[in-house]
Every structure is written in structure tokens, then in C-alpha cells.
Amino acid sequence: MVSKPLYYLFIVLLLTCYGQTISQNNEGDKIFGFTLSPLIPIDYFGAGPLILENNYSNIELSSKIGYQFGMLMRNTKSKNITLESGILFCRRNFKFIGENNFIGSSNSDVGDFGYINYAFPLNALVFIQLSDNVHMNTSLGAELDFYASAVASKSSQNFIHHYSERARWINGSVNASIGLEFRDKDVGVFYIGSQVNIPISTILVTHFKYYYAGSGGDFDDYEGAFLRGNYFNIQLKYFLPLSMENTKN
């Protein structure tokens, strides 16, 4: 986890970049579009499954496939460079599996939960033209993330009680992507690519109680586990044709 000074510096720099981008929105061609992406958890950078142990039980906490969708805007700065921003709805999903080894009582249980955030990405895209209609691009950028309130859930047999609280209400993350897009002046832009997203700091602090003697009986109280929420996604995007945007204007 990054130090507090670096965290605040990153947030301030990202807000400044957003302000500059908004102030320059009248420069260059703009197109608007939509995106839909599955979020695939990755085990790198400290985001792998967590094995939690207590006196009479243990719990494995890991990520599941989530999803993301939203609206995007591209602002062309030159033939090969474009800025892309937008607003996204993001849902990360997690699962937990628990077992107990209490004498005279043995049980296992499973459960899951989801966590929502709203993201404001800002990415710089560099294009390489492969043919008249096909372009490859790579991008690097950052994202401003706003997190929802705490979430709670219970396992399928009520042995495990879960509670997750947000580590902070605002956070930042780093994005990098590569992809291909097909452009048609009358139909629009179709894009498929992949992206990795790495939050700069913990997004969730997760707590468990395992009722190893049965629901409502004695329980193991787990210390908070810190979740990073890194993910890899397959990006699908569609942008309206520039001619349609010019007609609206």
C-alpha cells in the first residue's frame, strides 16, 4: 500500500489533469461511445487469494468475475494521439470458502459478495494505422474511483458472517491497455482490447465471523483483511460516427 503523501499527491495530480482536460474540451474532434467489459481478477501485485486462519476455522477469500459498463468520450489531439475519458459503473465480485476443525463439530460453508464503485478514467491513446479502416492502439492513464458504502452478507448455511467496509471513499488507479479498432465514417468505431487496472491503495477492509459451533453459537472473530481489487478486462467499445456528432452540433 502506498504512503499517505503519495496517495494524496496522486489524487491531486489526477484531479488537476481532469480539470485541464475539461477546460480544453472545445479543442479537437470529439466522439461519444459506450463500453461493456467483464472484469477478470488477477493474482499479481498482491491481489491473489487470501488464506485466513483462526483458532478453530480457516477461510479462503478470492475474486470472481465482475463487470463494468459506462459512457466514454474521445478528444482527438492529433492524427495518432487521442484522450479518452468517461464515467463507468464497476462491480467487483468476491467469494469465500470456510472450514472448521472444532472438536465434535465439523462443517464447511461458502458465500460471496459484490462491491460497487464509480470510475472516471482518463487515458492517453496512441494509434498505429494497420489498414484503411483498422488501427491498433496502446494506452496509459489513470482513474479516479469513488466507492459505495459498506456491504455485508452471510454464507449459504449462515456459519460465516461477512462485513466489508471501504478503506476510503476516493481512490486512484493506474490503467494500461492494448487493442484493435475498426473505423467506418458512416457506422462508427468498434473496438476490442484488453486492459489491466491496479488501484494505488487498498479498496476494502473485510471482516469475518465463523460460527464453528453452529449459527448463533461460539465463533472465531477474524481480523480485517485488506483487498486490492486488481483486475484484467476484455474491453468492448462502440463510438458513434463523427458525422453524427457534427450533425448534432
Label each residue range with its predicted role.
Residues 1-8:
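Bacterial N-terminal signal peptides that target proteins for export
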Residues 4, 37-40, 120-122, 193, ...:
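Hydrophobic alpha-helix-in-membranes signature
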Residues 8-17:
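Bacterial N-terminal signal peptides
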Residues 21-74, 237-244, 249:
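Short glycine/proline- and aromatic-enriched beta-strand/turn motifs that initiate or cap beta-hairpins
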Residues 28-30, 63-67, 114-120, 134, ...:
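Residues that define the transmembrane beta-barrel architecture of outer-membrane proteins
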Residues 44-60, 92-115, 148-168, 204-224:
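Flexible, solvent-exposed loop segments that connect beta-strands
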Residues 74-153, 184, 233-236, 240:
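Gram-negative (and chloroplast) outer-membrane scaffold detector with strong preference
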Residues 168-249:
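Predominantly the C-terminal beta-signal and adjacent terminal strand-loop region
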